[in-house]
UniProtKB/Swiss-Prot annotation:
<protein>
    <recommendedName>
        <fullName>Diaminopimelate epimerase</fullName>
        <ecNumber>5.1.1.7</ecNumber>
    </recommendedName>
</protein>
<feature type="active site" description="Proton donor">
    <location>
        <position position="76"/>
    </location>
</feature>
<dbReference type="GO" id="GO:0005829">
    <property type="term" value="C:cytosol"/>
</dbReference>
<dbReference type="InterPro" id="IPR001653">
    <property type="entry name" value="DAP_epimerase_DapF"/>
</dbReference>
<dbReference type="GO" id="GO:0009089">
    <property type="term" value="P:lysine biosynthetic process via diaminopimelate"/>
</dbReference>
<feature type="binding site">
    <location>
        <position position="13"/>
    </location>
    <ligand>
        <name>substrate</name>
    </ligand>
</feature>
<dbReference type="Pfam" id="PF01678">
    <property type="entry name" value="DAP_epimerase"/>
</dbReference>
<feature type="site" description="Could be important to modulate the pK values of the two catalytic cysteine residues">
    <location>
        <position position="169"/>
    </location>
</feature>
<keyword id="KW-0963">Cytoplasm</keyword>
<feature type="site" description="Could be important to modulate the pK values of the two catalytic cysteine residues">
    <location>
        <position position="218"/>
    </location>
</feature>
<feature type="binding site">
    <location>
        <position position="67"/>
    </location>
    <ligand>
        <name>substrate</name>
    </ligand>
</feature>
<keyword id="KW-0457">Lysine biosynthesis</keyword>
<dbReference type="InterPro" id="IPR018510">
    <property type="entry name" value="DAP_epimerase_AS"/>
</dbReference>
<feature type="binding site">
    <location>
        <begin position="218"/>
        <end position="219"/>
    </location>
    <ligand>
        <name>substrate</name>
    </ligand>
</feature>
<feature type="binding site">
    <location>
        <begin position="77"/>
        <end position="78"/>
    </location>
    <ligand>
        <name>substrate</name>
    </ligand>
</feature>
<feature type="binding site">
    <location>
        <position position="47"/>
    </location>
    <ligand>
        <name>substrate</name>
    </ligand>
</feature>
<comment type="subunit">
    <text>Homodimer.</text>
</comment>
Length: 289
């Protein structure tokens, strides 16, 4: 079967986008997702995104995300920006703002006149059981309004914030994000048994109260050039700990995101993420068996 696709990226976090809205697509197996995402023998991507018809009232589209390991995940902020650019560029909507169904609810995506996309990422969740994170038997340490949890990582105790942005995140503050051994500690944190669904590991260096450098080791994808939900989780943790003030410029290896959150006044407030969305090329590929 021939499969039309669009290759896109948001701040270097790259995606294969498939249109399941105007045409019926067969259910993709994990092996097929891995083959399409393979950078040597496939198209190459951190994630595969599916555009589908919504199944809930009030949504314009349904947005599904598969990591390059073949597993379906809850959310991807950089992918969300590419999603709205895709549906507008392909004539699926003329709206500047669209409401999109994801696993944990409905989010709003808005295309700005300057070509950037603003995503209402929803409110963060800090309650360990809802991340989910097993905090049983641990003595947390308060910093500001946040609780830091001790996690043994390769023989060293790391103090982490746990945050859900619809997907789980563990955030730690480091002195130098560029020099930190992200690809050593990242896999250990991702697979720590206290995270029953595994976790995205964020490593944040605070430059000023409005600026950070961030690297994220993503669950099921490894270190990526940018992670939108990871940027939101890091900023939320930093504001909650009293280290950051909104808005925050987040520098990643792939580009810059701007995160705004009124959480110092109301933790139920949604995080707003602004950043680029870019189409790289379009093509047709034979769907692997």
């Amino acid at each position: 079967m021939k499969l039309s696709f669009t290759k896109m990226h948001g701040a270097g976090n790259d995606f294969v986008v498939l249109d399941g809205y105007t045409r019926a697509l067969p259910p993709l197996t994990g092996a097929q997702v891995r083959a399409l995402a393979d950078r040597h023998f496939g198209i190459g991507a951190d994630q595969l995104l599916l555009v589908e018809k919504p199944t809930v009232d009030g949504a314009d589209f349904k947005y599904r995300i598969f990591n390059c390991d073949g597993g379906e995940v809850e959310h991807c902020g950089n992918g969300a920006r590419c999603f709205v650019k895709f549906v507008r560029d392909h004539g699926l909507t003329g709206k500047a703002s669209v409401r999109v169904e994801v696993k944990h609810g409905v989010i709003t995506l808005t295309m700005q006149d300057n070509g950037e996309v603003v995503v209402d990422m929803g409110a963060p969740v800090f309650e360990p059981a809802r991340v989910p994170f097993d905090a049983s038997g641990l003595d947390g340490r308060r910093e500001g309004a946040d609780t830091l949890w001790p996690l043994p990582v390769n023989g060293v105790t790391r103090w982490i914030s746990v945050v859900s942005m619809g997907n789980p995140h563990a955030v730690q503050i480091v002195d130098d994000a560029e020099a930190f051994a992200v690809r050593v500690d990242g896999p250990a944190i991702e697979c720590d048994p206290r995270f029953p669904q595994r976790v995205n590991a964020g490593f944040m260096q605070i430059v000023s109260r409005h600026e950070v450098n961030l690297r994220v080791y993503e669950r099921g994808a490894g270190e990526t050039l940018a992670c939108g939900t990871g940027a939101c989780a890091a900023v939320a943790a930093g504001i909650r700990r009293g280290r950051l003030d909104s808005p925050v410029t987040v520098h990643t290896h792939g580009g810059t995101l701007t995160i705004s959150w009124n959480g110092a006044c109301d933790e139920r407030a949604p995080l707003m993420m602004a950043g680029p969305a870019t189409t790289v090329f379009e093509g047709v590929i034979e769907l692997p068996a």
